[in-house]
């Protein structure tokens, strides 16, 4: 359906920030977008052994709970360490990693929803894809955060 926001997919790794991508978009609906975030510490501690909590690494419980390798297009999904490191450098603690991830996620969603509202009445829908995992994950979790 022309004008619908599902595809073509747009990614920051293609060289443009969401702030400019969404402002230039002109869709009737944005039906699949997301900014994954790290799950709260209290959730992580229920399934990641203490010795694996920080730093997150592939091949550990982080990977088995979708922080790495959750999507074939980018092995860093859904933790997105390269994205977080581009903005802030390496996190020095789990709490710092979580705080940075939460900030990036909240600012990204704020930008998308505010711009979708500015595009009213042409744009009538904005539905994110994140927050719908059916089980406890390390990143890109359910809104209920188990």
Positions of predicted regions on the chain:
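Aromatic- and carboxylate-enriched substrate-binding clefts and catalytic-loop regions
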Residues: 1-13
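Substrate-binding clefts and catalytic carboxylate motifs of secreted carbohydrate-active enzymes
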Residues: 14-146
């Amino acid at each position: 359906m022309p004008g619908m926001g599902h595809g073509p997919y747009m990614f920051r790794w293609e060289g443009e920030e969401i702030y400019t991508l969404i402002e230039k978009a002109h869709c009737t609906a944005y039906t699949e977008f997301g900014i994954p975030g790290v799950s709260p510490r209290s959730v992580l501690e229920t399934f990641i052994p203490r010795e694996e909590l920080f730093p997150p690494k592939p091949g550990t419980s982080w990977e088995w709970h979708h922080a790495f390798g959750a999507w074939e297009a980018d092995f860093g999904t859904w933790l997105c360490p390269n994205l977080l490191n581009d903005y802030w450098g390496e996190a020095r603690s789990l709490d710092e990693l979580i705080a940075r991830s939460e900030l990036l996620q909240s600012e990204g969603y704020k930008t998308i929803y505010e711009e979708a509202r500015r595009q009213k009445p042409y744009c009538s829908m904005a539905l994110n894809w994140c927050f719908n995992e059916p089980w406890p994950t390390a990143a890109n979790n359910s809104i209920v955060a188990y």
